Amino acid sequence: MKKTLLASSLAVGLGIVAGNAGHEAHASEADLNKASLAQMAQSNDQTLNQKPIEAGAYNYTFDYEGFTYHFESDGTHFAWNYHATGTNGADMSAQAPTTNNVAPSAVQANQVQSQEVEAPQNAQTQQPQASTSNNSQVTATPTESKSSEGSSVNVNAHLKQIAQRESGGNIHAVNPTSGAAGKYQFLQSTWDSVAPAKYKGVSPANAPESVQDAAAVKLYNTGGAGHWVTA
């Protein structure tokens, strides 16, 4: 990504602070966190425009990863800029009146210099996360959470999605609020209408996975997905 930096607005940051001028230091004499200062300058961190990087007078110039950075203060006024190493930097001679209050001040350079800077691409791609929406709490046995294991019934993709939304694929899941149970969270009356005679009156959560799958397929084929709220 490229962006144009204007020396009048971004390459030069000027603030005004109260205080007396101190000693002048150079980058070679100071223990600077160059990486941090470079990152703040590249991102136009407003902290650099609001206050000096340290108290007193200083004059730091250093090169870091293809750019030259300059930070200076006379103890009252402060300024900073950066430019691609090997090119001319922005004019640092701008002055502002002394005041007792800390305040950022915009400075217009005599000659506006523009340069194209290759901005680092730090965008991180976030993978969408599927979330299960279910107002009722479902209790489940942790060891029985995989869908379609131990079942030879051909379950279509939509039913598999319904099972995941309803119970996370847990064949023993039971909803204590509604009484719905099993992999597909059958109500007992619905279960009894599609279950084999052997399992009528038995909780769906106690039926084998293949029996639950077959009952769900039968219900889906005869009445569609409308029996499930999460469908």
Curated annotation (Swiss-Prot):
The terms describing its cellular component in GO are: extracellular region
The alphabetical list of record keywords is:
Glycosidase, Hydrolase, Secreted, Signal
Report the protein's function.
Is able to cleave peptidoglycan and affects clumping and separation of bacterial cells.
Q: Name one Pfam family in it.
A: Transglycosylas
The keyword Secreted appears for this protein:
yes
UniProt keyword Mitochondrion present? no
Q: Which SUPFAM superfamilies match?
A: Lysozyme-like (SSF53955)
Question: What is the protein's name according to its record?
Answer: Probable transglycosylase SceD
